[in-house]
Amino acid sequence: SAAAVKAGRVQPVLLKVYSDDDFLYPGQESGFVQHSLHEVIAEIKKLPGLHLAGLTHFPCLLWDEAAGKVLPTPNLHTLVQARDQLAKSGIAIEQLNVPSATSCTSLPLLAEYGATHAEPGHALTGTIPANQQGDQPERIAMLWLSEISHHFRGDSYCYGGGYYRRGHAQHALVFTPENQKITETNLKT
């Protein structure tokens, strides 16, 4: 707040909300509990240089293997309830930021819930769980280049970021200096 005022700016902020029954990934637990929303907003209003632009939560959609499609999570319902709660109090927000599993096929679902913003994430590379068969509009376009760090009990391990565990990758192409050809292998997750 003080930095925004010093810079002569009003900084738009998103408020992350959650409810006790929501699904949170380990290490990503954060936000303000929905039932304290009005108290939190009252405190934000006391801070000059800040403007509550919207609400967010994560993950709002997830691939459901049994249903064979992306479905809303309880988090999305919490987010929509928080938006409605604010609207009933006369507080309009400009953004409903609804990240996770965004793709061409999930955009209509996001629109049904009034989402204004989403994140493309793995849809940009076509590596979303919904695209395991390559039948979605997004094209698989990702090369993950790494090196083997060590071998242990018949398995090879590698370093490097970018591997998406929930992406259900099953195969890899391996090129070794000793073997000047590409070898297909199975992945363990």
Can you say where each PLM-predicted feature lies in the sequence?
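Conserved AdoMet/S-adenosylmethionine-binding subsite of the radical SAM
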Residues: 9-15, 23-24
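Active-site loop/helix belt of alpha/beta enzymes
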Residues: 19-134
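Active-site loop ensemble at the mouth of alpha/beta enzyme cores that anchors a bound cofactor
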Residues: 102-180
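A conserved acidic, glycine/proline-rich C-terminal tail/linker
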Residues: 184-189
